[in-house]
UniProtKB/Swiss-Prot annotation:
Coiled-coil segments on the chain, per record: none
Self-association and partners: The basal body constitutes a major portion of the flagellar organelle and consists of four rings (L,P,S, and M) mounted on a central rod. The rod consists of about 26 subunits of FlgG in the distal portion, and FlgB, FlgC and FlgF are thought to build up the proximal portion of the rod with about 6 subunits each.
Record-level GO cellular component terms: bacterial-type flagellum basal body; bacterial-type flagellum basal body, distal rod
Similarity comment text for this entry: Belongs to the flagella basal body rod proteins family.
Name this protein carries in UniProt: Flagellar basal-body rod protein FlgG
Keywords from the named record: Bacterial flagellum
Main location per the UniProt record: other
Gene Ontology biological-process annotations: bacterial-type flagellum-dependent swarming motility
Compartment annotation: Bacterial flagellum basal body
PANTHER family according to UniProt: FLAGELLAR BASAL-BODY ROD PROTEIN FLGG (PTHR30435:SF19), FLAGELLAR PROTEIN (PTHR30435)
Lineage of source species: Bacteria, Pseudomonadati, Pseudomonadota, Alphaproteobacteria, Hyphomicrobiales
Length: 262
């Protein structure tokens, strides 16, 4: 009985949907987190009767066919790269990107990763790093006697060194754009890597045309909408229950047939 197998694919799809929603809710307070959405496509169809072929008398064309779908499958889990809410922190090394762009982060193996989480700090060498200690690209070194650190909307990092009256430029933040942000691969720890689907990064200066700008002492919160996630959770739960009901009904029908054959 095909209904059993079809409903099973529906339950499996809704299980995936529930897991994606659960992960969104779990990361509702994660800096720079981008909510995900499960997307589904129908499976193959079994043709019971072809459309567009001559009828039995060969006098007319059959206008409609009979194609029975065999279920559903998960086609993608897409990250939605919309702007998250801004959170004021008062920390001079916290930076939020407003608009398009990704911070460039140097991974342990020397490769470049990308993040929207601008919760930066200084390491023992004075280099600007992420909360996990990865260097920001390009490298920006902040002397121990630096005061009044300022990061402009264009990414220029300046500070007064020691008792100097004038500001000294310490470096320039750059950000990367991608042709297809949905093609970036999430790695955890607020990091993404480029893939052939995302295209190569195009690096530029904040506030240039087609690039967002940066805001000091702010962080970008997650773009998870709690109300929407709870609504989607209820919808997924109901769909799961209905597929379960189909399996129960198909099993009862098969049971009736088997009893009548005795």
């Amino acid at each position: 009985m095909r209904a059993l197998a079809i409903a099973a694919t529906g339950m499996d799809a809704q299980q995936t949907n529930l897991e994606v929603i659960a992960n969104n809710i779990a990361n509702i307070n994660t800096t720079g987190y981008k909510r995900a959405r499960a997307e589904f496509t129908d499976l193959l169809y079994q043709t019971e009767r072809m459309q567009g072929v001559p009828n039995r008398a060969n006098q007319a064309i059959v206008p409609e066919g009979a194609n029975i779908g065999l279920g559903v499958q998960t086609s993608a889990v897409r990250n939605i790269h919309t702007q998250g809410n801004l959170i004021e922190t008062g920390n001079k090394l916290d930076v939020a990107i407003i608009g398009q762009g990704w911070f460039q982060i140097e991974a342990a193996d020397g490769s470049t990763l990308y993040s929207r989480a601008g919760a930066f700090n200084k390491n023992a060498d004075g280099n600007l790093v992420t909360v996990d200690g990865y260097n920001v690209i390009p490298n920006i070194n902040i002397p121990t006697d630096a005061q009044d650190i300022t990061i402009t909307r264009t990414g220029q990092v300046t500070a007064r060194i020691g008792n100097a009256a004038d500001f000294t430029q310490l470096g320039q933040l750059t950000i990367a754009n991608f042709a297809n942000e949905a093609g970036l691969k999430p790695l955890g720890d607020n990091l993404f890597s480029q893939t052939p689907a995302s295209g190569a990064p195009v690096v530029g200066v904040p506030d240039d045309p087609s690039y967002g700008y940066v805001k000091q002492s702010y962080l970008e919160g997650s773009n998870v909408d709690a109300v929407k996630e709870i609504t989607d959770l209820i919808t997924a739960q109901r769909a799961y229950e209905m597929n379960s009901k189909v399996i129960t009904t198909a099993d009862e029908m098969a049971s009736i047939v088997s009893k009548n054959l005795k």
